[in-house]
Regions:
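Conserved HGGG/HGGXW glycine-rich cap/lid loop of the alpha/beta-hydrolase fold
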Residues: 1-45
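Conserved alpha/beta-hydrolase "acid-adjacent" motif
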Residues: 191, 195-201
Length: 239
């Protein structure tokens, strides 16, 4: 069972290394980079989902299960309109949109706009703030943040234009129509204490107890087991 692992904003594929010792034997995981991250050449910006699809097509085979975390989940969903669909899509810490109306938690449009302004002024400092922000819901937030910094370093492995494009996608992507009538089975998972998601988005997902937005740091073994379990269930569903 092939799993293609897709990371979120400002975080390259090294985030998935914590799961390497915990995958059950049928799973063949492969963590891939988005354009502009790691050694993957960046796309010219501004760019489109169609251009992203053209670049990512060799990395996203249809005979696999895609696993998209955070922005990676939003992008993977949007790509369903442009690429042959996978056997299934697992969304981790992602809903149909990034921003919420603020009535039941999550990140509001005003909060994201403030973050974008801060990023334009000081990209690296704002990225470091984001690492602290997304670690907040973990049971040991300081330890989760320490792990993030140790794994990712002092600066993002992505160029500033790529990161700015990612923030624009967080602002604008709306996958409600796609998720209402998807071309493949879709299963959702979320940390029970993920402060970046609204409570209504978390309630639509299989919740991982004692985890926030980064369950690969706080709950690597349970997360690997749940991803394998949900992928197996999704593969048994009619397409």
């Amino acid at each position: 069972m092939k799993l293609i692992l897709l990371s979120g904003w400002g975080v390259d594929r090294r985030i998935w290394q914590t799961l390497s010792e915990h995958w059950p034997s049928p799973v063949e995981p492969s963590a891939v980079e988005w354009p502009g991250y790691g050694e993957s050449p960046a796309l010219p910006t501004p760019t489109s989902i169609a251009a992203l699809a053209k670049r990512m097509a060799p990395e996203l085979p249809s005979d696999a299960v895609w696993v998209g975390w955070s922005l990676g989940g939003l992008l993977a969903t949007a790509l369903l309109d442009h690429l042959p669909p996978p056997k299934a899509l697992l969304l981790l810490g992602a809903g149909s949109r990034f921003c919420s109306d603020g009535k039941d938690g999550g990140v509001t449009h005003d909060e994201l706009a403030s973050f974008q302004r801060a990023f334009r002024r000081a990209p690296v400092a704002t990225w470091r703030h984001f690492l602290r922000w997304q670690a907040q819901g973990e049971p040991y937030a300081r330890e989760a943040h320490r792990q993030l910094r140790a794994r990712l370093g002092e600066a993002p492995h992505a160029d500033t234009d790529t990161l700015a494009q990612g923030l624009m996608w967080l602002e604008t992507l709306d996958n409600r129509a796609l998720l209402a009538s998807p071309p493949c089975p879709i299963h959702r998972l979320a940390g029970a204490h993920d402060s970046l998601l609204s409570s209504s988005t978390r309630q639509q997902a299989l919740q991982l107890e004692a985890a926030g937005h980064c369950p690969m740091l706080s709950q690597p073994a349970p997360l690997a087991a749940r991803l394998a379990e949900q992928a197996t269930r999704a593969l048994q569903e009619p397409r």
